[in-house]
């Protein structure tokens, strides 16, 4: 809802300021194609979420994969038969166009993962407020400012290959640097500020590379398409951004929780609900007698009600000194598991960017420009 006022102002401004343009010869919109595309993407998201949340429902996973595959194949076949397809797949035969789309998907995929991973990690482990963790994650966008502004100027001097593939490679390096910043005390309890220098440096470096890529990906997509496909190319560009963000939240978000479930080692006597998510573990810690440390105390007011007293087992239900000690052990176990899953997700982002850099470097010739 925070975006509603901004959208309302933009809509009013467009209504009164933007000139109206109509194309009497516009291609007809094909509703069945849109439905098939929506069904294929929705099934893909459902399959990803099902596969990354143990215990895996094999029946639901198989149904989602089969539905997505059938809908995707039906969409492709329909586009090949239509005189005015919703998506002309021949556009992807142009290397610059394909590289631009891949670059756009890679950037938005990684950006979504960074925003989610950093904000979640520094809220649940380091005790940051949502505003503080959001501002920390936004350092990535600060890094994109110089390269995204200057990318268009550099394009005619160094070409698409260095900007798209090179930008993705620099972004991967930044992700690796950022993944090393886990602020922990020697005692094992998380610190609020240690290691932030590495994180900020890594996010700035990643932003610098991703900004260079995204600044020219649009140029590569639109200018590589024939004039009569310019509108379709613009639509593909927008879908690439949205598809990357969609995959990021569905895959990396689910993986963040799924890996936590795999990595967490619960102390004896702790309710199994603590293995579902770190918020559930913190809820149990708080319910055992308020054992949350000072830097996490404010989270106790906002935790979801995932457990109640009858759900506690062993000494955690006693509310005594032993309960508080076991709660402290659960806290460290949960935070350690979440940090491990966070690190894996950050490294996976670096791997995705490295793969994107290699593929786009193969697609594009040295000093190639969009044409």
Can you annotate each of these PLM segments?
Residues 1-33, 59-62:
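Helix-loop-helix hairpins in multi-pass membrane proteins, especially solute transporters
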């Amino acid at each position: 809802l925070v975006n509603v006022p901004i959208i309302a102002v933009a809509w009013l401004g467009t209504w009164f300021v933007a000139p109206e343009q109509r194309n009497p010869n516009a291609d007809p919109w094909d509703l069945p194609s849109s439905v098939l595309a929506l069904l294929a993407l929705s099934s893909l998201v459902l399959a990803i979420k099902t596969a990354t949340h143990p215990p895996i429902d094999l029946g639901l996973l198989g149904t989602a994969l089969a539905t997505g595959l059938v809908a995707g194949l039906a969409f492709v076949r329909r586009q090949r038969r239509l005189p005015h397809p919703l998506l002309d797949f021949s556009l992807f035969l142009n290397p610059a166009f394909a590289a631009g789309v891949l670059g756009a998907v890679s950037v938005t995929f990684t950006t979504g993962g960074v925003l989610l991973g950093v904000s979640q990690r520094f809220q649940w482990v380091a005790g940051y407020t949502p505003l503080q963790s959001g501002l920390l994650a936004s350092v990535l966008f600060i890094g994109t400012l110089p390269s995204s502004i200057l990318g268009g100027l550099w394009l005619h001097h160094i070409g698409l290959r260095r900007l798209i593939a090179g930008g993705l490679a620099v972004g991967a390096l930044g992700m690796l640097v950022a993944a090393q910043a886990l602020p922990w005390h020697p005692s094992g309890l998380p610190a609020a500020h240690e290691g932030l220098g590495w994180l900020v440096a890594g996010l700035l470096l990643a932003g610098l590379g991703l900004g260079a890529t995204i600044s020219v990906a649009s140029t590569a997509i639109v200018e590589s398409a024939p004039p009569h496909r310019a509108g379709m190319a613009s639509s593909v560009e927008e879908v690439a951004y949205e598809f990357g963000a969609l995959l990021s939240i569905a895959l990396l978000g689910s993986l963040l929780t799924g890996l936590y479930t795999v990595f967490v080692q619960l102390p004896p006597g702790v309710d199994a609900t603590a293995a579902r998510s770190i918020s559930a573990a913190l809820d149990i810690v708080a319910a055992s007698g308020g054992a949350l440390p000072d830097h996490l105390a404010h989270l106790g007011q906002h935790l979801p009600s995932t457990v109640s007293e009858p759900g506690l087992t062993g000494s955690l239900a006693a509310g005594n000194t032993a309960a508080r000690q076991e709660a402290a052990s659960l806290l460290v176990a949960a935070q350690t598991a979440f940090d491990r899953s966070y690190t894996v997700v950050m490294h996976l982002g670096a791997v995705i960017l490295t793969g994107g850099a290699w593929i786009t470097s193969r697609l594009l010739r040295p000093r190639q420009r969009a044409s």
